[in-house]
């Protein structure tokens, strides 16, 4: 009888479940085929070594993929499709469950929405008094290193939805999640603007490449 380590990813998944697969095996399952002279497991291993992790792989752009032997446009499209499926899954899950059950769930959702974006995107999650999700919206879009945020528009949308609280989030395409002075200032402005309408700002999360910063966790909110 074959041991689990000797099984191909598909057979291993069918026998022991998807969670039994390593990152290399899971990637090989999606890639399906290798390249001339290189089987799919070897290709998957080399790709992960190049990008460091699944996170680094799925947030990479095509220019970064071009430096990897065996990755053409077709396989790049496959991998970006996987990332988009994950993003849509979290979006649907958020809408259907209508609840942020933990800080981890909030972070995972925001990472799924903002990772890999080439411009700064400012997203707001609107919550009711029980912290159930009413809506999440990409309210502002900017450049590579700046996004202009208008606090009054956030408040206007919150009032329209009858929201009692909001969670702010934006990405840093550079990869470093550390907040800038401008990030801190705009957070203060949004908080002050929301306070006039008795709307709480629960957190502001900055999403980088494989890292994040939570203003609430740092005691800034």
UniProtKB/Swiss-Prot annotation:
| Family stated for the protein in its record | Belongs to the UPF0758 family. YicR subfamily.
Specify the MPN domain's residue ranges.
99-221
The UniProt record lists the keyword Zinc: yes
Biological process terms from the Gene Ontology for this record are: proteolysis
- Mind telling me which Gene3D superfamilies this protein's record contains? Cytidine Deaminase, domain 2
Motif JAMM motif positions after renumbering to this chain? 170-183
Gene Ontology MF terms in the entry: metal ion binding; metallopeptidase activity
Name the UniProt key words of this record, in alphabetical order: Hydrolase, Metal-binding, Metalloprotease, Protease, Zinc
Which InterPro entries does this UniProt record tie to the protein?
A: MPN, RadC_JAB, RuvA_2-like, UPF0758, UPF0758_CS, UPF0758_N, UPF0758_YicR
Binding positions for Zn(2+)? 170, 172, 183
Instruction: Note the Pfam families from the entry.
Output: RadC, UPF0758_N
Superkingdom of source: Bacteria
What is the protein name given in its UniProt record?
UPF0758 protein YicR
**What species does this protein belong to?**
Salmonella typhimurium (strain LT2 / SGSC1412 / ATCC 700720)
Q: Answer yes or no on keyword Protease.
A: yes
């Amino acid at each position: 009888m074959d041991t689990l380590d000797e099984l191909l990813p598909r057979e291993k998944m069918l026998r022991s479940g998807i969670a039994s697969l390593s990152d290399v095996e899971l990637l090989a399952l999606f890639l399906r085929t290798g390249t001339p002279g290189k089987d799919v497991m070897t290709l998957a291993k080399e790709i992960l070594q190049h990008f460091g992790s699944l996170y680094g792989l799925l947030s990479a752009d095509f220019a970064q993929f071009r430096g990897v032997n065996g990755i053409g446009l077709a396989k790049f499209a496959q991998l970006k499709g996987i990332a988009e499926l994950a993003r849509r899954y979290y979006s649907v899950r958020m809408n259907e469950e209508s609840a942020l059950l933990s800080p981890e769930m909030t972070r995972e959702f925001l990472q799924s929405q903002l990772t890999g974006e080439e411009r700064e995107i400012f997203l707001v999650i609107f919550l009711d008094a029980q912290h159930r999700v009413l809506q999440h919206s990409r309210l502002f879009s900017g450049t590579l290193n700046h996004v202009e945020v208008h606090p009054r528009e956030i408040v206007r949308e919150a009032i329209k939805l009858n929201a009692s609280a909001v969670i702010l989030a934006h990405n840093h395409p550079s990869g470093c999640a550390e907040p800038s002075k401008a990030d801190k200032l705009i957070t203060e402005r949004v908080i002050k603007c929301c306070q006039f309408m008795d709307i709480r700002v629960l957190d502001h999360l900055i999403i980088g490449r494989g890292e994040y910063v939570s203003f609430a966790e740092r005691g800034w909110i």
